[in-house]
Amino acid sequence: MSTRERNAPEKLSERCLLVLNHISWVDIFVINARSPATFIAKSEIRDWPFVGWLCTLVGTLYIERGRPSAARKASRAIVEQLGGGALIAVFPEGTTTFGRGLEPFHAALFQPALDADATVQPVALRYLDAAGGHTDAAGYVGETSFLESVWTIVSTRHIVADLNFLGPIAARGETRRSLAEKTEAAIAAALEVPAPESSHSRRRGPGRRAGPPGE
């Protein structure tokens, strides 16, 4: 697997929340190969065989779902890290897809960007085959096991992780809902897929939930 970047800035903003669509467990390694980041994920992932170990290894901040106090504590930790110049990466769909569509973004994950007066950096992620077309080979979706996913990836001759850096969005003056909607629209346009409907009016697909539920 190789990586290709488009429109990448020479340097990301000092306080930067990196926002991506989510396709696979491989995504975190694709990002870390470019810029080491702290990832945000639901606490259950920590106990997933091997995947949890990998996520912890690269640096992941886990959030316990269903516990408002834990969510507030995690949010404060994210704000502190953003203020200290750490790069924070989130997958606000909260699940994986094959990248042929986009799920609604959880607005709650954008609150730390507001509190830290950070910049939101949308990135559209795709996996391409040797001919430059879309491939599902990297997808970790539905009932696919981790071993099945690994085997599909290593047995696919050529996969390119395509990272398209879109226009940054200053959090100042925005709301978490407006940030979610703007990043949804930007990433959907870059992927050439329809922008998702409201998270309150659309059922989620069969992907793997990757983060805490939000609005």
Which positions does each model-derived feature cover?
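Hydrophobic beta-strand scaffold residues
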Residues: S2-T3, F39, Y62, I88, ...
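Catalytic core of membrane glycerolipid acyltransferases/transacylases, capturing the structured
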Residues: E14-P68
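Generic beta-sheet signal
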Residues: K42, I63, F91, V123-R126
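A cross-family acyltransferase "interaction/gating" segment
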Residues: F50-W53, R67, F98-S178, K182, ...
